[in-house]
Design a protein with these regions (language model features):
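Phosphate/nucleotide-binding beta-alpha loop and adjacent structural elements of enzyme active sites
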Residues: 1-183
Length: 183
């Protein structure tokens, strides 16, 4: 539950869909969050296989070779590289999201491939009210040139808040209903 953006909500009674590529993680999720749906797979721009870089601190694990290289310095180091299957977010939601269930809250934190995950969604069919996305090395002033922020804004999401590396975007229709102002 360390660094979890969703465990607090689970403890309040919310349920959801957990996705983690780290082999063996699904068992831990199922034990800690038995009411949730848990899937052990990677999400990417297209179906296939990607190299997964596992670190001595799992919070740094990534499919991004660039992020792995950037973080592979003491006290952290890559302990394993493995080819893992990945699918698009839209396909995962097609397979796992119960029919008729709306997504209120989605958090994407993939250590460097967040844009690929966001871009692989079908935003007409799967439209979370709130999207949290990690944008590494990005400040609010950088958003106009950030491809992930531009993609979300093009899908009618507006920035609401930012913490460290995580940006909170709210669907415009939800923001209007909730009387939420842009950041």
């Amino acid at each position: 539950v360390r660094y979890s953006n969703t465990y607090y909500f689970y403890r309040l009674g919310w349920t959801g869909l957990n996705v983690d590529a780290l082999p063996g993680t699904a068992n831990l999720f199922r034990r800690m969050r038995p009411k949730d749906i848990t899937v052990e797979c990677g999400i990417g721009a297209k179906e296939g296989f990607l190299t997964y870089f596992a670190f001595n601190d799992p919070a740094l694990n990534t499919f991004s070779a660039q992020e792995a290289e950037r973080k592979n310095h003491p006290p952290y180091h890559v302990v394993n590289k493995v080819q893992l299957p990945v699918m698009t977010l839209a396909k995962l939601l097609d397979q796992q999201l119960p029919k008729g269930m709306a997504i209120d809250f989605m958090t994407v934190d993939t250590e460097g491939l967040d844009h690929d995950v966001i871009a692989s969604n079908d935003w007409d069919r799967y439209r979370p009210k709130v999207v949290l996305v990690e944008l590494l090395n990005t400040g609010i002033a950088d958003l106009p040139s950030n491809p992930t922020a531009r993609l979300l804004q093009g899908q009618r999401y507006q920035l609401y808040a930012k913490t460290c590396n995580t940006f909170f975007f709210v669907a415009q229709e939800a923001a209007h209903r909730w009387n939420v102002q842009s950041a």
